[in-house]
Structure formats: structure tokens, C-alpha cells
Amino acid sequence: MQTSDGFIWYDGALVPWTGATTHVLTHSLHYGVAVFEGLRAYETLRGPGIFRLREHTRRLFDSARVYRMKIPFSEAELMEAQCAVVRTNGLAAGYLRPIAFYGPEKRGLNPRGASVHVGIAAWRWEGYLGPDARARGVRVKTSSYARHHVNTNLPRAKLSASYANAILASMEAAEGGYDEG
């Protein structure tokens, strides 16, 4: 994965990868209040094509509404920003990660009054479990961590806090020698 070269779209500007920084007191870092999407861009005869760009961008805004987060850009602006990140980084295909989160201005649980920031990263993607996973197969484990019941969170919204169990399951699987949990 690309970690230092290229550009990230951050709050309306393309900045060097290492320049996309966030304050340590960012509300979303402390309370898991962020929304994000994961999109694939595929190589086509007409250049890179971002799969279901409009639908993913719409879901980002729908997810933000769950947290009463007002994204300071329009859907059209974020769709163009996602295209710009792919273009600027010279990707024929890859993975995009737009994320919106509350800034550092507020302490405590309620983020009301905090700024909202948006970042979009894109990088080459060889596949979630590696480029040879299809050919070699993968080892999976049923995790001891149960998925939250549908009434305890919002499964249709891409909320960062909703991924805590999945992260624990993935770590448990890896510690047991599996590819995925």
C-alpha cells in the first residue's frame, strides 16, 4: 500500500500524503465518530472507472446524517474530488477511502459545534487478502466476537465505531494463523 508518495484530498485541497494530518484531540479519534466509504476504481478502455461512485457518495452523506454531521462539501464536489485523487495519483485502478470526521474543538461526547473534515485517499490495491488469494485460497475462522444485533447499531450506515467487532475478529483470526475472521 502506498504510504508516503502521492496526494490526498483533504478539506478541499490536494495535499502531499504526509501533509494530511489530524490533531490528536480530534473528537472522532476519541469517540469513534467518523463515517467512511470504500470504493474500487477499475481500469477501463476510457481510463479509470470508479465503481458506483454516486451510490457510495450518497451513502457517505446518509451515514453522516446519522451523526448529524454536516459535510461542508456537496455530493458533486466529493465525487469530483474522488476522481481528482485517482487522476492526480496516476492510478489506472485502485481503492479509494473517503472519510468525514469531527475536529478537535469539542470535548465530551456531544460533538455539536465541532468542525467537520473530509479526507479522500486512493492507492493501488492488490486485493484484500493479497494478489494470490484467489489462486491459493484463504483460511478463515468463525470469530468468537458476535456481530451487533441490528437494533443496537445502524448496519446500513458506514460508521467507524461499527467496525470495532470486525477489527477484533480479524485480529483474533490472524493470531490463530488464519487469513480472515
Model region roles, listed by residue range:
Residues M1-F73, E77-A84, R107-G181:
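Helix-start/capping segments and mature chain N-termini
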Residues R87-G94:
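Short secondary-structure junctions
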Residues F101-K106:
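Short, internal active-site loops enriched in acidic
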